[in-house]
Amino acid sequence: MAAAAGGADDESRSGRSSSDGECAVAPEPLTGPEGLFSFADFGSALGGGAGLPGRASGGAQSPLRYLHVLWQQDAEPRDELRCKIPAGRLRRAARPHRRLGPTGKEVHALKRLRDSANANDVETVQQLLEEGTDPCAADDKGRTALHFASCNGNDQIVQLLLDHGADPNQRDGLGNTPLHLAACTNHAPVITTLLRGGARVDALDRAGRTPLHLAKSKLNILQEGHSQCLEAVRLEVKQIIQMLREYLERLGRHEQRERLDDLCTRLQKTSTREQVDEVTDLLASFTSLSLQMQNMEKR
């Protein structure tokens, strides 16, 4: 009974109940004039015999005493303030971290960002990004908002996502980067934006193809097919030229880039399918050479 009464007195003096799941600690010796928790004061209290319920006070093996020693080791007078933490913050840090994943609201925002990028909704994309929605979050197929925007050719959304930290080299479930998808469409500005944002032209998909390989495949299709109209073919060739120009610019191959500029000028002057085919053949040879140089560099 006396022990129980003593325990009750301890609880009343500490102002806290053991039912809170926290140790009762006398506030006066443990807080400074500013109400800050001090490990130094806590260690002194332990050394002075102020024990914790259910623990041996002042024991040499006390985890709290060991923590106190580590905290004070090699401390200099100017570091005194570093040894003080607000008591409330210390209690919060001691609690288990309960956030195991995004909340339902956050999941909805992530999905909405991808859907908005896919729907070319620039205003909603910007709003969600400014609210802190993660631009790198992917769906169950590994596709991010940047994958959707690159595939759709929306250069404005692509730039917005890159400005807010989207990874231009993030792969989807098939290993495609946004540049792989952009290389399969007719949107040269997106390719330029991705390359300037750090996209790698030598990134491999799961089939071992780079965006340059996809460009070469498109050129082969253009050389074999005759069903597309002249303007569509010209647009395809222009896109591939633009991608190669940015690639060579990043590598510092200015002489080769000038050759591409000449091809682009010739393309603009074409008026017949035969002239476009001639430029396409030259570009195919140039692309093959670029791929060979790329493979040599990897070795």
UniProtKB/Swiss-Prot annotation:
A motif (Nuclear localization signal (NLS)) lies at residues 98-116. The modification N-acetylalanine is found at residue 2. Residues 140-240 are annotated as: LYN-binding. Keywords: Acetylation, ANK repeat, Cytoplasm, Nucleus, Phosphoprotein, Repeat. It is found in: Nucleus; Cytoplasm; Midbody. ANK repeats lie at residues 108-137, 141-170, 174-203, 207-239. PROSITE patterns: ANK_REP_REGION, ANK_REPEAT. One of its GO terms (molecular function) is protein kinase regulator activity. GO terms for cellular component: cytoplasm; midbody; nucleus. A motif (Nuclear export signal (NES)) lies at residues 282-292. SMART domains: ANK (SM00248). Residues 1-32 are annotated as: Disordered. The modification Phosphoserine is found at residues 57, 62. GO terms for biological process: nucleocytoplasmic transport; positive regulation of erythrocyte differentiation; regulation of intracellular signal transduction. Plays an important role in regulating intracellular signaling events associated with erythroid terminal differentiation. PANTHER family: ANKYRIN REPEAT DOMAIN-CONTAINING PROTEIN 54 (PTHR24197:SF44), ANKYRIN REPEAT DOMAIN-CONTAINING PROTEIN 61 (PTHR24197). Interacts (via ankyrin repeat region) with LYN (via SH3-domain) in an activation-independent status of LYN. Forms a multiprotein complex with LYN and HCLS1. Interacts with TSN2, VAV1, DBNL and LASP1. This is Ankyrin repeat domain-containing protein 54. The gene is ANKRD54.
